[in-house]
Amino acid sequence: MRIVINGFGRIGRLVLRQILKRNSPIEVVAINDLVAGDLLTYLFKYDSTHGSFAPQATFSDGCLVMGERKIRFLAEKDVQKLPWKDLDVDVVVESTGLFVNRDDAAKHLDSGAKRVLITAPAKGDVPTFVMGVNHQQFDPADVIISNASCTTNCLAPLAKVLLDNFGIEEGLMTTVHAATATQSVVDGPSRKDWRGGRGAFQNIIPASTGAAKAVGLCLPELKGKLTGMAFRVPVADVSVVDLTVKLSSATTYEAICEAVKHAANTSMKNIMYYTEEAVVSSDFIGCEYSSIFDAQAGVALNDRFFKLVAWYDNEIGYATRIVDLLEYVQENSK
């Protein structure tokens, strides 16, 4: 599979890192970003959160060079002018955060790409897939797809375990979310969300999120049953989902823990992880699981009403699932 990465920010760089780390058969042929290639090479090599990577990487002749591997840098703002046909691109990893609806993403197809994977919640009628939850519903005819959000990738596996074992009546989710690049280091104007413009490392900032509602896109049985909000907090990486849920059938917190533990070792292996350790957020920097269930952190009010907690590295964990989905698409499009 020949892919290009459109947008070489936090997620774009970590997708490439994970592809190289696992020696994936995926071939990255180009990166399109308006930032200069030598600076992007520097940002790829040195990461303040996840450490340095590919120390041998250099910028030469407009390419990111690592030994025999060369990845071409492009800096084209107009998607319809990109040379995807000439490069024989199978999939565009759309990680700018800008082309999230079908019409905008389809411009990559007009440029010659065969498929687009949006690394964000998509707007409109775009099939959304969460690994371990509904990825097997992928149809090769789906030429524009979404990998949902990092938060949905944490919540949906947990919701599926609850749905399959106990049923879900309704639930509210809060994600206590690490700061992201869209936030300001110090107070500044944010027209759409005034609070979002306040200093990221000085405040706990309430914010909106569609992550809980998006679970209904991959688990239709839960459409209209989940919603939620976010608190942006002053940490660089790792977030946590707090799910308050009313179940359909009576059970115990211990039974929920057993169901999650079983799933983590079977159907959700490599997607979910179960821990009873006294963990904190930094313990999961670099963790590749989508959802780490914290058995010590949850509580029960009665036999149908529970608060459940799951951690996730909102960068590496999510980037890993993007690579998983790319490889699944490759294997199931032949």
UniProtKB/Swiss-Prot annotation:
One of its GO terms (biological process) is glucose metabolic process. The keyword Nucleotide-binding applies. InterPro entries: GlycerAld/Erythrose_P_DH, GlycerAld_3-P_DH_AS, GlycerAld_3-P_DH_cat, GlycerAld_3-P_DH_NAD(P)-bd, Glyceraldehyde-3-P_DH_1, NAD(P)-bd_dom_sf. NAD(+) binds at R10, I11, D33, K77, T119, N314. It comes from Chlamydia trachomatis serovar L2 (strain ATCC VR-902B / DSM 19102 / 434/Bu). The active site is at C150 (nucleophile). It is an enzyme of class 1 (oxidoreductase). This is Glyceraldehyde-3-phosphate dehydrogenase. Belongs to the glyceraldehyde-3-phosphate dehydrogenase family. Its main location: cytoplasm. One of its GO terms (cellular component) is cytoplasm. Homotetramer. Pathway: Carbohydrate degradation; glycolysis; pyruvate from D-glyceraldehyde 3-phosphate: step 1/5. D-glyceraldehyde 3-phosphate binds at S149, C150, T151, T180, T209, G210, R232. Keywords: Cytoplasm, Glycolysis, NAD, Nucleotide-binding, Oxidoreductase. Catalyzes the oxidative phosphorylation of glyceraldehyde 3-phosphate (G3P) to 1,3-bisphosphoglycerate (BPG) using the cofactor NAD. The first reaction step involves the formation of a hemiacetal intermediate between G3P and a cysteine residue, and this hemiacetal intermediate is then oxidized to a thioester, with concomitant reduction of NAD to NADH. The reduced NADH is then exchanged with the second NAD, and the thioester is attacked by a nucleophilic inorganic phosphate to produce BPG. It catalyses: D-glyceraldehyde 3-phosphate + phosphate + NAD(+) = (2R)-3-phospho-glyceroyl phosphate + NADH + H(+). The keyword Nucleotide-binding applies. Pfam families: Gp_dh_C, Gp_dh_N. It is found in: Cytoplasm. GO terms for molecular function: glyceraldehyde-3-phosphate dehydrogenase (NAD+) (phosphorylating) activity; NAD binding; NADP binding. The record marks H177 as: Activates thiol group during catalysis. It comes from the Bacteria. Its EC number is 1.2.1.12.
